[in-house]
Curated annotation (Swiss-Prot):
UniProt record similarity statement: Belongs to the glutamate--cysteine ligase type 2 family. YbdK subfamily.
Region (Disordered): 1-21
Alphabetized UniProt keyword annotations: ATP-binding, Ligase, Nucleotide-binding
Biased composition regions of type Low complexity, renumbered to the chain: 9-19
Species per Swiss-Prot/TrEMBL record: Mycobacterium ulcerans (strain Agy99)
BP GO annotations: modified amino acid biosynthetic process
InterPro entries: GCL_type2/YbdK_subfam, GCS2, Gln_synth/guanido_kin_cat_dom, YbdK
Keyword Nucleotide-binding: yes
Short name of any one Pfam family annotated for the protein: GCS2
EC number per UniProt: 6.3.2.2
Gene Ontology MF term list: ATP binding; glutamate-cysteine ligase activity
Regions crossing the membrane: none
Keyword field contains DNA-binding: no
Name of the protein: Putative glutamate--cysteine ligase 2
Length: 392
């Protein structure tokens, strides 16, 4: 009989010696409060052609020194980040404050801000790389796949109080992977073609050698051993080169959720941030209560990722280690109901309630396809519609 907590690996520990792991201990900063922070990636698009514009260097230079605005791998991208916040609503207002001036500079240069998982028709071969050693090294190693990374996403950090909680929470969060991807899926197009997927970004990003689903380690020491092995064998030089869809950020004391496609508007972003915040805090509190968190076998987790990427809100997902299945939107309703008390305690009840609006109005990939159909397949109209959704 399967234990009530779900699937458990007999041992997932890396092969490194205990002495090696001790010498390479990773300190976790710890967050005394369950804080939240957001990283929001934007593409720059030409106001006339609606194609991508490689002008991020000039835009960031005009913005000036600002810890809330960062460069990224490609020169068509700027990243806007929040500070350390107490709630989803606070994070959204923080982002709004930064976006206003940044958007005015972008407009003055004849461009628009655009955020989706992929651009509907841009070609990766015309995009320019940001001048930085770490990006050059990434492309040198990954070659064709690295140059294909014409993708944008949303990353959410949630503070965790102890390193001992991190890996159990990450493993349990994988049960909600398809919910988050289906809700945020916004990348049906690739190079002007409809891929048939709700999130082609999810399929693309996992091609990088250290990206994709995390290993389901049970303890922090197992994660330390994994990082030791990765460094010793030359796979990574720094821990931030582990690009998992959910990963620890030890220096910040957070778990970073990197599942979601790019999000076009602040209301949906606030809803998704609230959902992720509530999920992590709920699991954290269940650990405090002595509960063993439920997990699923990695083959179920992998299948759920694919189903959500392919079918979006129409995905029938695997729920547990017993292989029970359910439509993702039906299960989402129960998840939202269960998280309502958590949301009230985190002052994000309104934002969490807004999650239910996404299936009602259609996720971004569905809205994009509707616009394309209404405009005889003109993908510039899709870009227009998405730009209009960014109401600051």
């Amino acid at each position: 009989m399967m234990p009530v907590s779900g699937w458990r690996a007999v041992s997932s520990a890396p092969a490194s010696s205990s002495a090696g792991r001790t010498a390479n201990r990773i300190d976790f900063a710890r967050s005394p409060r369950p804080t939240v922070g957001v990283e929001w990636e934007f593409a720059l698009v030409d106001a006339e052609t609606r194609d991508l514009s490689n002008e991020a260097t000039a835009v960031i230079a005009e913005i000036g020194e600002n810890p809330r605005v960062h460069k990224e791998l490609l020169r068509n991208t700027v990243e806007v980040v929040s500070g350390v916040c107490g709630s989803a609503g606070e994070a959204i207002e923080d982002l709004r404050t930064t976006l206003g001036p940044a958007r005015r500079i972008v407009h003055a240069r004849g461009m628009e801000l655009f955020c989706e998982g992929t651009h509907p028709f841009a070609q990766w071969s015309t995009q320019k790389l940001t001048d930085a050693p770490r990006y050059a090294e990434l492309i040198k190693r990954t070659q064709w796949w690295g140059r294909q990374m014409l993708i944008w996403g949303v990353h959410v950090h949630v503070g965790v109080s102890s390193a001992n909680k991190v890996m159990p929470i990450i493993s349990a969060l994988l049960n909600y992977y398809p919910h988050l991807l289906a809700l945020s899926a916004s990348s049906p197009w690739w190079g002007g073609e409809d891929t048939g997927y709700a999130s082609n970004r999810a399929m693309m990003f996992q091609q990088l050698p250290t990206a994709g689903l995390p290993f389901q380690f049970q303890t922090w020491s197992e994660f330390e051993g994994f990082v030791y092995d990765q460094k010793k064998t030359g796979i990574i030089d720094h821990i931030n080169e582990i690009r998992w869809d959910i990963r620890p950020s030890p220096h910040l004391g957070t778990i970073e959720l990197r599942i979601c496609d790019g999000v076009s508007n602040l209301r949906e972003l606030g809803a998704l941030v609230a959902l992720m915040h509530c999920l992590v805090v709920d699991l954290d509190r269940r650990l405090d209560a002595g509960e063993t968190l439920p997990t699923m076998p990695p083959w179920h987790v992998q299948e759920n990722k694919w189903r959500a990427a392919r079918y979006g809100l129409d995905a029938v997902i695997i729920l547990d280690a017993e292989s029970n299945e359910r439509l993702v939107t039906d299960d989402l309703d129960d998840v939202l109901t269960r998280l309502e008390p958590v949301a009230r305690s985190l002052s994000c009840a309104d934002e969490l309630a807004a999650v239910a609006e996404i299936p009602r109005v259609g996720a971004s990939y569905q809205r994009q396809r509707r616009v394309a159909e209404e405009h005889d397949g003109d993908l510039r109209a899709v870009v227009d519609a998405l730009i209009a959704e960014l109401d600051i």
